[in-house]
Structures are given as structure tokens and as C-alpha cells.
Regions:
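Helix-adjacent hinge/juxtasegments
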Residues: 19-59
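Generic non-transmembrane alpha-helical segments
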Residues: 27-30, 34, 67, 71, ...
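Conserved short beta-strand edge segments in small beta-sheet-based binding/regulatory domains
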Residues: 35-47, 77-84, 109-123
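Strongly charged, low-complexity linkers/loops
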Residues: 67-90
Length: 141
């Protein structure tokens, strides 16, 4: 996903790739060789905020609408369009959250799905919440 950074007059591109350390190092080297690339940041071991957006259109008849809206509320999703036969939802979160919502809504009939893929920014606080989850710590602010 490519997003223009208004403050610097540059664009930011987020890529999610899988591979061993050698493959990722080679990819980083190749990207850094490109003329218009100012830098490459590997977020693998950094404290970062990661999110993904999903738009989902689900069949919603009168007798199922309240059940669907209950699920939507639990996932903190937003209803962005309504018709007699369908609801269009917007949900933001980690991929696990999006997949869980999709699975719960499948029985109602998913008509369309669009997903952005991950976007990420380094955490200013430096706190790696993923490591807190792994170590079963809770963070209270």
C-alpha cells in the first residue's frame, strides 16, 4: 500500500513479505539500490502499530439484522451502508480480528470483501505490545 506523507513530500510503501533471514536481507539490499527509495525499515523486531482495514458486505434480512449488528458491535466495526438486503461494514484491526469477524458472518452470507493489507508505523513509546502478549503481561495506562 502506498501512502503520500504530506509533511515530507514523499510516499510510504508498506510491504509484508515472508522468508528466511537471508531472503529478507537480500530483498532489503535490492530495495535500497533503487534510485527513488530513501530507506527501508524492517518492522519485524520493532515496537510497531499494525492495522488492516476490511470492507465487508453481508446479506442482512429483517430476521437476521439484529444478530449481525450484535456481532458488529462486539468487533467495534462500523456500518457504512445499509439496504433492505445487505449491510456494508468497515472494520479495522489486526488480521486475526478481521478473520474472526469474517468467520462469524459467513453463515449470514458474505456478498463482497475488500482488504487493504497491513500498514504499520513505529511506536513512539517504544513499547512492543506483541511481546507483552507473548509473555502474558497486561499493560494498564
Amino acid at each position: 500500500m502506498c501512502i503520500r506523507d504530506r509533511s515530507k513530500g514523499i510516499s510510504r510503501l508498506t510491504m509484508v513479505v515472508e522468508g528466511d533471514d537471508e531472503t529478507l536481507q537480500q530483498m532489503t539490499k535490492q530495495l535500497n539500490k533503487l534510485f527513488n527509495v530513501l530507506g527501508v525499515v524492517d518492522f519485524t523486531n520493532l515496537a510497531a502499530v499494525e492495522r488492516e482495514l476490511m470492507l465487508l458486505k453481508v446479506s442482512s434480512k429483517e430476521d437476521t439484522r439484529s444478530n449481525i449488528l450484535d456481532i458488529v458491535q462486539i468487533f467495534r466495526a462500523k456500518v457504512v451502508d445499509v439496504s433492505d438486503m445487505a449491510l456494508t461494514l468497515e472494520v479495522v484491526g489486526d488480521p486475526g480480528k478481521l478473520v474472526a469477524l469474517e468467520k462469524l458472518l459467513e453463515p449470514y452470507g458474505i456478498l463482497e470483501i475488500a482488504r487493504t493489507g497491513k500498514v504499520a508505523l513505529k511506536r513512539s513509546s517504544g513499547v512492543n505490545t506483541e511481546m507483552l502478549k507473548i509473555n502474558n503481561y497486561s499493560l494498564e495506562i
